[in-house]
């Protein structure tokens, strides 16, 4: 039974991630993210639709029901709070944080979650700059939602810009090779870099080191101009 619950939570969290990244949630995208077969994904989505968690639209995109979205937000909140704990207090290697938090999100109790909100210094964003959602649901008031910047692939084409890295979405954290390249170049949340959005790729330069991201990963980088991005 627990395996079924975990599978449901993983699917809902993946749909939530895709929405955050500006990607249409399709069963094919879930199959890619979770490395599962098409038939397996279709069967699981059909079960989730029967359970009232998602709805398959005529264009085949997946829409979470209010119940499904509430569960997705709860799972993502626990995931990102776990990331903060693992980084800020335990001091786990940043390259291991995402995978470890994926385990914690399914077993963290509501009591522990509320306690984390009390002991952590920053519960607005994960260590990767991603907003921690649904804090009001556990009694934490926020004046406003944190800004999320703009996707690197949505920057003007061919123009060199000075920007600050504000967010690295989940798909980039999972790609250990590319994430390590960024880390080795000193590119992390809060780093100021020079960036050019070219056709099909984004080039980021920091301290003389140049990192190239193709669009399938560059969409997961969000930035803001050092002097503000409109």
UniProtKB/Swiss-Prot annotation:
GO terms for cellular component: cytoplasm. Its main location: cytoplasm. The keyword Transcription regulation applies. Keywords: Cytoplasm, DNA-binding, Iron, Repressor, Transcription, Transcription regulation. It holds the Pfam family Fe_dep_repress. GO terms for biological process: negative regulation of DNA-templated transcription. It is found in: Cytoplasm. The keyword Nucleotide-binding does not apply. InterPro entries: DtxR/IdeR_SH3 (IPR040767), DtxR_MntR_Metal-Reg (IPR050536), Fe-transptr_FeoA-like (IPR007167), Fe_dep_repressor (IPR001367), Fe_dep_repressor_sf (IPR036421), FeoA_core_dom (IPR038157), HTH_DTXR (IPR022687), Iron_dep_repressor (IPR022689). Residues 4-65 form the HTH dtxR-type domain. GO terms for molecular function: DNA binding; DNA-binding transcription factor activity; protein dimerization activity; transition metal ion binding. Transmembrane segments: none annotated. Iron-binding repressor of the dipheteria toxin gene expression. May serve as a global regulator of gene expression. Represses ripA under iron excess. Homodimer. PANTHER family: IRON (METAL) DEPENDENT REPRESSOR, DTXR FAMILY, IRON-DEPENDENT REPRESSOR IDER. Belongs to the DtxR/MntR family. This is Diphtheria toxin repressor.
């Amino acid at each position: 039974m627990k395996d079924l619950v975990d599978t449901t939570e993983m699917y809902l969290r993946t749909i939530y991630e895709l929405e955050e990244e500006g990607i249409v949630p399709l069963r094919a995208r879930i199959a890619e993210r979770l490395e599962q077969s098409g038939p397996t994904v279709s069967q699981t989505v059909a079960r989730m639709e029967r359970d009232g968690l998602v709805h398959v639209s005529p264009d085949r995109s997946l829409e979470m029901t209010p119940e499904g979205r509430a569960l997705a937000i709860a799972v993502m909140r626990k995931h990102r709070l776990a990331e903060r704990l693992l980084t800020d207090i335990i001091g786990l290697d940043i390259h291991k944080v995402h995978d470890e938090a994926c385990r914690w999100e399914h077993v963290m109790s509501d009591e522990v979650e509320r306690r984390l909100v009390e002991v952590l210094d920053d519960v607005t964003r994960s260590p990767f700059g991603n907003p921690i959602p649904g804090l009001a649901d556990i009694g934490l008031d926020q004046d406003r939602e944190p800004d999320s910047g703009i996707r690197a692939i949505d920057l003007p084409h061919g123009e060199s810009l000075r920007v600050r890295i504000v967010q690295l979405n989940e798909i980039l954290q999972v790609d250990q090779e590319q994430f390590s390249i960024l880390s080795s170049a000193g590119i992390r949340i809060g780093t100021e870099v020079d960036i050019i959005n070219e056709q099909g790729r984004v080039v980021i330069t920091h301290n003389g080191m140049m990192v190239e991201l193709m669009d399938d990963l560059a969409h997961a980088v969000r930035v803001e101009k050092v002097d503000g991005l409109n």
